[in-house]
Amino acid sequence: MAHVITRINAREILDSRGNPTVEVDLETNLGIFRAAVPSGASTGIYEALELRDNDKSRYLGKGVQKAIKNINEIIAPKLIGMNCTEQKKIDNLMVEELDGSKNEWGWSKSKLGANAILAISMAVCRAGAAANKVSLYKYLAQLAGKKSDQMVLPVPCLNVINGGSHAGNKLSFQEFMIVPVGAPSFKEALRYGAEVYHTLKSEIKKKYGIDATNVGDEGGFAPNILNANEALDLLVTAIKSAGYEGKVKIAMDVAASEFYNSENKTYDLDFKTPNNDKSLVKTGAQLVDLYIDLVKKYPIVSIEDPFDQDDWENYAKLTAAIGKDVQIVGDDLLVTNPTRITKALEKNACNALPLKVNQIGSITEAIEACLLSQKNNWGVMVSHRSGETEDVFIADLVVALRTGQIKTGAPCRSERNAKYNQLLRIEESLGNNAVFAGEKFRLQLN
């Protein structure tokens, strides 16, 4: 029996930062299937276009009524009557025909908006899973050509200290994460992470005062830390105090494009201070040396966005220097885009992809980006955005694609824990068929 789409309705809802985003209800004979899309704070210039209204009289210009209108008036009439199990056909129709906008890196979604297209793409996936009478993660595995008899539960990368564009402190690096690779299961990994998180909170309160334990957009703390060493020392202390030394490692998201000066090709590690300390302005080569020193001193297993999104040369230098032992993740560099992934492969610029579905704008393209990365023995980290919703799609996606790692914030704030809680449910439902990535999080079963 064909399960055709009978109705599509889009609406404007609020994300976790209080900004509007797109939610879609898609109806078939089996029911209503809902999806909501996230948005990022530090976005790469090569990401697919997130369509905003720019009407300053509503939501300070951040409304998404244009994207809603595009769904209800342009996309919906074309999709009604189509079979919800035709994921690739529907995604291609939206991306290539109904939108059709392109740039040098591929389909840009600048006409209809990646937020409009992705919301429908996710809802179609949920409807397709129901039509096939399987869970969403099993259906996504089928779409990706993965075997569905053995699923991999990811290591959670929990963002517990915030800096950069996510915080009001002086810290230039954006995220410091704890990575419980030594746990025997996802359930235990989450427990390790939560215990380290609460221990860290106590350490911060003791050292910086109670005000320093307020949480940021992703649930992490933003104490008045001045540099990366101070943040890393705090994490090492918290991990040790919680009893998980050796079992919980550290990851960083530097988001270096946020403090890169393209005119003189330098990185300002004091970019949040009006009269910055000139000794903290570094060349790319100096930054390479800084990362190498940090990796020697601390149990760092992953560094994301260590350089600007166009600084291919220093990416390649760092990957050559420490890539064997440390995951070098290209976020703003790659923006989940297969064309940019191909360029990075040619240049040996990095060795891991952060998979953010809203950077590319459709589930079909996101799966393609993941498979291309895995085929070339890269790590793949499925990732949230700083502006999230209660939608848990990425939890099913990470299990389906067997990437072995997920980044979706601290074990705090409901829009973050919603994803972790969904992973607990999936692990429980899989029983003995669940494999936890653990120490092998970089290269999982493909």
Swiss-Prot record:
Residues engaged in binding substrate: 166, 175, 304, 331, 383-386, 407
Annotated positions of the Phosphothreonine modification: 339
Organism: Plasmodium falciparum (isolate FCR-3 / Gambia)
Modified residues (Phosphotyrosine): 139
Biological processes per GO annotation: glycolytic process
Location, primary (coarse class): cytoplasm
Membrane topology: Peripheral membrane protein
Motif Pentapeptide insert, residue range(s) on this chain: 104-108
Residues modified as N6-acetyllysine: 133, 375
Pfam families per record: Enolase_C, Enolase_N
List of residues binding Mg(2+) 2: 253, 304, 331
Name this protein carries in UniProt: Enolase
UniProt lineage: Eukaryota, Sar, Alveolata, Apicomplexa, Aconoidasida
Renumbered ranges of motif DKSLVK motif: 277-282
